[in-house]
Amino acid sequence: MAVTREDIASALAQALAPSRLEVQDDSHLHAGHAGAREGRHFSVRIDAEAFRGLARVRRHRLVYDALASLMPQGIHALAIDARTPDER
């Protein structure tokens, strides 16, 4: 079963308790791209206190850790914008 944006949103909400969360399926923008056959492309905008004091790489690691069980199920690409609530 293919991963949906709802699957991603649920996993991130449970792991990081974000104050803002937007998940967009960008797969249609990559039609014909070799990786599009093997998985889907998503963009995530997330604001969470869990990111406070962390560098961008550590923030992205938290997001990837939260999605670890979904990654092998069909996420080919993930664009991440991770901030604290007061950084927006």
What are the functions of these language-model segments?
Residues 1-5, 10, 48, 66, ...:
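N-terminal/domain-start segments enriched in small and hydrophobic, helix-friendly residues
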Residues 24, 45-47, 81-83:
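Solvent-exposed beta-strand sheet faces enriched in polar/charged residues
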Residues 30-33, 41, 60, 76:
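Histidine-centered active-site/metal-ligand motif
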Residues 38, 46-57:
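A short interface-forming secondary-structure element
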Residues 54-88:
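C-terminal structural segments of small proteins and small subunits
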